[in-house]
């Protein structure tokens, strides 16, 4: 686990890039700090499901809903939450699902046709049907009746814990143990570790405008192209001190600039944070940058490109992410391999001529030099750990974290 010195160093390094963290807890009006899920419809209103009820936030005021205020709510532990196109709110619990519409609660359980009371995820397809991922399978509600699917229909063991839809309106679902599931409305197709998926525990899925599937697993991020063939795996979006590299993904989302945001939590280290990908390189954020806590549970990007990160300690909102993320120099600059055993290569295809400083986690400059070619080698004889490259091209300064094994 990173120590305080690492936190302070990386705080000053990343904080200089300009993003803002705003944190919310019970002191601000949140019903409970242990936040499990989040949703928004684009109106600027956020809804959060917690261990002890529901919180609605309009940017100024908080409204809380619990079984004490609304007796129709089946449980205070909210396992899934979704605001629908028509404004209805659906929430999932371990005892069934609830719909809040026109100030009225309606509950659905197995007695009403639900396949399993233990809801994990709720979403809506373009035709207005409600899709409910459950511990034991899938239920689809057409407004009147439920259609249910489970292992006998082809869903692998592990149930459904995430659902997204592609450009062809096929559903892509994450299984708790069985991998990535494609459902065309008739049959299920399974993609698992035999197809290159990093791990068969799939926690989150997001599909981009090229119909690529970004699949968050318990071992990292797998990307399948529009032909559903594995394109790439990412296992170190959020850098950890050696020898730890595991990056379990808890949430995914794209903003309007096509920046990918990834929530990561490594439970055995009690460490976690948020990684951002600009299509070329990763930047990560953690508690040292202002994130409220390491136990990431969900991540939602709203229509204003605000990134809402839910944790067991409260909520962080990330805003004002600077345009450096799409800067040509940064995109063209490669530092590889990273991590390394001590030898790093720096390559830039667009220009040459840099002043580079290598700093340790305390901010001390270990060496400084000038690079005049497009490709250069750096030797780092120091001990294993996290270091920072400060790179200046004469007009701008950039930072890259490097890890020496």
Q: What is each stretch, according to the model?
A:
Residues 1-4, 404-405:
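Positively charged n-region of N-terminal signal peptides that target proteins for export
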Residues 3, 16-327:
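Carboxylate-rich, polar loop motifs that coordinate divalent cations or form catalytic acidic clusters
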Residues 4-14:
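Sec-dependent N-terminal signal peptides
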Residues 11, 316, 343-345:
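Local alpha-helix boundary/kink/capping signal
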Residues 14-15, 383:
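Generic detector of short, well-ordered, non-transmembrane alpha-helical segments enriched
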Residues 328-336, 340-405:
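C-terminal outer-membrane/trafficking sorting elements
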């Amino acid at each position: 686990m990173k120590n305080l010195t690492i936190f302070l160093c990386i705080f000053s390094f990343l904080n200089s890039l300009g993003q803002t963290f705003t944190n919310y807890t019970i002191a601000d009006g949140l019903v409970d700090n242990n936040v499990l899920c989040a949703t928004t419809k684009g109106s600027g209103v956020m809804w959060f499901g917690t261990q002890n009820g529901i919180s609605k936030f309009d940017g100024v005021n908080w409204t809380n809903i619990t079984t004490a205020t609304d007796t129709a709510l089946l449980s205070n532990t909210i396992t899934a939450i979704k605001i629908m196109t028509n404004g209805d709110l659906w929430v999932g619990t371990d005892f069934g699902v609830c719909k809040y519409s026109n100030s009225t609660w309606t509950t659905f359980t197995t007695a009403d046709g639900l396949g399993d009371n233990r809801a994990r995820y709720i979403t809506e397809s373009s035709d207005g049907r409600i899709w409910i991922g459950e511990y034991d399978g899938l239920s689809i509600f057409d407004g009147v009746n439920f259609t249910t699917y489970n292992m006998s229909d082809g869903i692998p063991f592990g149930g459904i814990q995430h659902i997204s839809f592609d450009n062809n309106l096929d559903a892509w679902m994450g299984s708790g143990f069985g991998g990535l599931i494609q459902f065309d409305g008739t049959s299920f197709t399974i993609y698992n570790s035999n197809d290159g998926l990093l791990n068969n525990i799939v926690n989150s899925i997001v599909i981009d405008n090229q119909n690529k599937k970004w699949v968050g697993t318990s071992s990292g991020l797998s990307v399948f192209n529009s032909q559903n063939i594995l394109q790439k795996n990412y296992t170190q979006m959020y850098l950890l001190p050696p020898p730890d590299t595991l990056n379990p993904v808890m949430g995914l989302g794209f903003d309007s600039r096509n920046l990918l945001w990834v929530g990561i939590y490594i439970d055995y280290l009690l460490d976690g944070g948020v990684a951002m990908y600009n299509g070329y390189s990763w930047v990560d954020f953690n508690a040292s940058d202002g994130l409220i806590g390491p136990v990431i549970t969900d991540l939602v990007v709203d229509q204003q490109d605000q990134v809402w990160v839910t944790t067991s300690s409260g909520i962080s909102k990330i805003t004002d992410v600077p345009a450096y993320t799409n800067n040509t120099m940064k995109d063209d600059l490669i530092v590889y391999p990273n991590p390394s055993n001590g030898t790093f290569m720096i390559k830039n295809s667009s220009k040459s001529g840099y002043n580079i400083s290598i700093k340790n986690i305390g901010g001390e400059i270990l060496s400084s030099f000038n690079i005049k070619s497009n490709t250069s080698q750096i030797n780092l004889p120091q001990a294993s750990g996290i270091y920072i490259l400060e790179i200046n091209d004469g007009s701008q300064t950039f930072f890259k974290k490097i890890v020496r094994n």
